[in-house]
């Protein structure tokens, strides 16, 4: 045997060995998959949302589009945290759909609207099947705009296969064996699995089928069966999502440094009382005093019309706040700088929740000492993250908590001026009426952490 033939033989043998090894790994993986659809009934599943129809035929779940109804979801009765999900699906050339993972339906969130991660089924020319969309929350997190191999992997009008891994904060997807998405996101770690029949609007076609089969899970010893992905991870922590970039949002904090921020009463960032660690900006516990340690911090820039979002996490009994339209020149003495405040508070343990010149106006998400947030608001437990969202355009202001609007008001209105006149701010001239001001994170001497601090501004032409 010549050297060339020997090399060819070795290469061929190695190739066959690799194929056999991969096949054995795939078979071992399949041996540990457990069906969550019995092939005959919809036992273990229920519908949420709209009124699209689901039925079982020939071992397949078939969802059918219906006119004049919102998105419909067939979801598992059980919820899952870490898992590997494999399934087959088929749709026509126009009907968008998706597979929900770690999704939820809570009474407090938009009257039970299904929300959470969706692995997209996209038969359009865009071909983003396998991308990760955040249903009824943040929209696109990992589209396939920069992944042509995954786009080409989708087979129109034919059966396709998804592999989906959800482990900790990491989500990975494959379509027909081709890596599609690799996302690192901390928002939701548990929820149901769901099969979507998308609403079709006025122009869509009713009676179109979307079909799924071989829906199987691994939930035990999941780490043993993970597959490596060559795709670089899209990390959302302290970064702008795809949709945020398209929508004109900017980072207000870079997740690493103090750039863009200073002390409210000094020109530099405080040397003590604040800490940056693992992508979190924390005001430290120093005894519960108002601005007595490091002091409040503010943006160096001032803002007029804007939206700002801040993820915050409190400790037991903690007090803090997000202030806006702040004038740092107003109060150079003791205490916090003056501005409108989105209250951050442990309502159950901090006495401030029962104080104030207007009932309930010092509870979490309220306009501090002026307007109470909706008492039915949902606050995640101590130690978990919550999202504050403040919208201020043309003096019309809204406070949102965890995706739900909890109050609104108009700066400068008769009602607003009356509330100010009855509050602790009655002696501050033009309180809350400035055209623009700083945004502030409050030091109230309790441990509170912040991340994902983002802003969207509106210019004169957009007002």
Language-model-detected regions and their locations in the chain:
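Bacterial Sec-dependent N-terminal signal peptides
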Residues: 1-31
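Carbohydrate-interacting regions of secretory-pathway proteins
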Residues: 25-463
